[in-house]
Amino acid sequence: DQGIRAFQQGNYQKAITLFQQAVDANKNDPEVLIYYNNALARKQGSPFTLAVVVPLDKNQDDRNNGKEILRGVAQAQEQFKQKNGLNGRLLEIVIANDSNKEKAKEVAQELTKDSSILGVIGHNSSDATRAAIPEYEKAKLAVISSTSTSIFLNNPVFFRAVNSDESTGKTLAEYTYKTLKKAVIFANPNSPYSNSIREVFTNQFEKLGGEVVRKPLIDLTASTFDPEKEVAKSVYANNAKAGAALLFPDTRSTNIAINTAKEITERNKTLKTENPPRPELKMLAGDTLYTNETLTSGGNNVEGLIIAVPWFRETLQAKSFAQKSARKWGGDISWRTATSFDAAQALIKTLSNNATRDTVLRGLENVSLTASETSGYPLRFTSEREREGQSILLEIKGGKFVEITPSQL
């Protein structure tokens, strides 16, 4: 707090000293590292300013996601400083907190009013991003999300540093259809993310010749939802007989999805003992279940779960960045840190001596980053401002996430 006070009073040297102490004491905290680098940038003079919008309120999952995003942004800011910025000008990062979609719109309005802000990284959820985009469009302010994957987000100022649900849903549909022809979907109908990935999966699966039973979905969030009953119905009902269960919770209903996985695992034990034995119900999911929480609270019940993700620290391409980051933060990083680093790198690439919101927005369209400038995979945008590239499939084996390599497909 003293550091923040010194910074606000323009006493940057004092702020630098205080934030340096805070950084040394909290190696894992990206916020203090950003404040430290902001103070250095101000002291140096004429910093370039970008904003990052993350949820930093009471909800622990949201806070964790927010911190993961900030780690990626802090790492890019730090790297820019180590290269002495651009002609000696460093980067200042404004951190804004949006814990819900109402707040997201307000935050976007505030950021657009600050004319020094050249670009925005955010928001975390597709819900929040959707609420905020119209404000950025009015101000012609580029926004690049590293975590919002919904296909319903499309705007001339909106870019994505993460694969959209188009890529994830398609990958899951193709993988499922290779071995199973009937699928059931558990999702939250009120979430743009859940709806988006469900729609892509359904369209693609049906196009291949598969059938989604109990359409359009089983609502995980309904007050009457009974996982045991719904799983049994999906397997046994004459018009169902699903072979695959797709779990598409939003970030707020992941615990219900993990409970559902538990019921599927229980049901699979019964299916094996039937005469004749019935094949097990295969579980698949999107990236909302790609968390340590899934492994710890799911335990044996999530064994065999297949998840499509945007980035995985064990792949050949990601290893070098993942190891460097783990040393920096004192522990493994998540995909959110990787894609947020990439989002910040894309914005940094557009900076020039006389950068304006307009030059940044136009620059993003032509950004091309090599694998050595990102978290491991090249970054280019399609004409729709989507990130080029494929989702990665993982399986939970022995309580760990393991890559399903293309040769295993």
Stretches found by the model and what they are:
Residues 1-409:
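Extracytosolic ligand-binding ectodomains
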